[in-house]
Amino acid sequence: MTATLERNASVSLWEQFCGFITSTENRLYIGWFGVLMFPLLLTATTLFIIAFVAAPPVDIDGIREPVAGSLFYGNNIISGAVIPSSAAIGMHFYPIWEAASLDEWLYNGGPYQFVVMHFLLGVACYMGREWELSFRLGMRPWIAVAYSAPVAAATAVFLIYPIGQGSFSDGMPLGISGTFNFMLVFQAEHNILMHPFHMMGVAGVFGGSLFSAMHGSLVTSSLIRETTENESANAGYKFGQEEETYNIVAAHGYFGRLIFQYASFNNSRSLHFFLALWPVVGIWFTALGLSTMAFNLNGLNFNQSVVDSQGRVISTWADIINRANLGMEVMHERNAHNFPLDLASGEVMPVALTAPSINA
């Protein structure tokens, strides 16, 4: 009997680390993008929670009138927010070491920049990690491509818009009511509801919701029953089974008769491509619209566009919207300036459509 002895090939610590990072056998895939993603998102989340709970007021407008956003200073979950960096900081990079003290850094809204920068890099790495895992598993890369839509939207409101407006103080606050305030001010200053790219985003989000509900309900309604009436139809499905789980012919026939024949997909691949494409393209265009409005290429303006033969303005719905925009604009940053730019420059603009009659 002959025994063969073979020395095990030694694997360096670095090779073991690389194998662990890139292994698809882990319960949670890490990947090289994950090496950056996990610490970035954990750091952003940690400081967001601390700032949301305990950050002192921030001089957002740069006029020595701090605005409180944390729970410790009287806010609740709805009204609380991480307040954007001060207008006195502008677009300057403002890490902790650039401030004279921690108190100054907090007063000027340093945590906002900290959270936003780490968050944007973190979600970008998450997108890269999606691609990396798809690559390791031999899948196509469209999951990461779809995720690029919300990444683009977040980048637009947290980075591109402040760059275009010249200050991080114009970025979206990190809170519920702060988000709504950002939306109202954005409408007032850029007329976003009249921008075609925003309209495409609305069609993408609401259309995507409609198509998702239609698809899910059609599939659920055309499941191939493998069980008796006394047990759930779900019990007839086995993970990884070769047989189809629903009858696409039945779903196609139902929907084709409900609307018309060519409104229904007869190809599962083209159907799911459409379901992915519609909302993604819509949100891409919304992000693109936000990025153009950041540099004041605003929504369509039809104010005072209808006049009579004497040149007098005939008010339209566009003029009603314009009046609402002016009202929203004069309410925000009320102490930073006496009048909004639309009222402080140019010719006098009437804010009432018709003058009230006195003693009539």
UniProtKB/Swiss-Prot annotation:
It comes from Cyanophora paradoxa. GO terms for molecular function: chlorophyll binding; electron transporter, transferring electrons within the cyclic electron transport pathway of photosynthesis activity; iron ion binding; oxidoreductase activity, acting on diphenols and related substances as donors, oxygen as acceptor. Pheophytin a binds at Y126. Chlorophyll a ChlzD1 binds at H118. [CaMn4O5] cluster binds at D170, E189, H332, E333, D342, A344. PSII is composed of 1 copy each of membrane proteins PsbA, PsbB, PsbC, PsbD, PsbE, PsbF, PsbH, PsbI, PsbJ, PsbK, PsbL, PsbM, PsbT, PsbX, PsbY, PsbZ, Psb30/Ycf12, at least 3 peripheral proteins of the oxygen-evolving complex and a large number of cofactors. It forms dimeric complexes. Chlorophyll a PD1 binds at H198. SUPFAM superfamilies: Bacterial photosystem II reaction centre, L and M subunits. This is Photosystem II protein D1. The D1/D2 heterodimer binds P680, chlorophylls that are the primary electron donor of PSII, and subsequent electron acceptors. It shares a non-heme iron and each subunit binds pheophytin, quinone, additional chlorophylls, carotenoids and lipids. D1 provides most of the ligands for the Mn4-Ca-O5 cluster of the oxygen-evolving complex (OEC). There is also a Cl(-1) ion associated with D1 and D2, which is required for oxygen evolution. The PSII complex binds additional chlorophylls, carotenoids and specific lipids. Its main location: plastid.
